[in-house]
Amino acid sequence: MADVPGAQRAVPGDGPEPRDPLDCWACAVLVTAQNLLVAAFNLLLLVLVLGTILLPAVTMLGFGFLCHSQFLRSQAPPCTAHLRDPGFTALLVTGFLLLVPLLVLALASYRRLCLRLRLADCLVPYSRALYRRRRAPQPRQIRASPGSQAVPTSGKVWV
């Protein structure tokens, strides 16, 4: 078996054994693909949650910057028909004041959603690509002598 960079020599019965190089390469590609898919789903979920919760503050800031005479001097009908500069200033101030609490709320809801979906459990470490697990040895059953009765033990010790 060829040496795998970063892999340790396995002592028989000591732990996981290194994979073959081709098997290691294929597992590394699959692990990378799975981790990239999980990361893309995380990013999509983050954008969806942040976009939904921060929408009121972003809308206020957008109209405030778009219609205030100090910034873009837009003469669009929605800007001139409804508010003047003091109203757009109020939109800017309210948007900035709402931004931080809504951001905290959005990040808390994203964290809760990630914990509920257990997305961190979907990430696979690269050590799984380099090493293959050994099967745990089966426990040997002790046979009772023909004349004695076998008493089932639960594995608990009462002291």
Swiss-Prot record:
Q: Where does it primarily localize? A: membrane
Q: Which UniProt keywords apply?
A: Cell membrane, Developmental protein, Membrane, Transmembrane, Transmembrane helix, Wnt signaling pathway
Membrane topology summary: Multi-pass membrane protein
Query: What parts of the sequence cross the membrane?
Result: 43-63, 88-108
Localized where?
Answer: Cell membrane
Q: InterPro entries attached here? A: TMEM88
Family (UniProt): Belongs to the TMEM88 family.
According to the record's subunit comment, the protein's assembly and interactions are: Interacts (via C-terminus) with DVL1.
* PANTHER family noted in UniProt: TRANSMEMBRANE PROTEIN 88, TRANSMEMBRANE PROTEIN 88-RELATED
Question: What is this protein's name?
Answer: Transmembrane protein 88
Source organism per UniProt = Homo sapiens
Q: Which gene name does the record give?
A: TMEM88
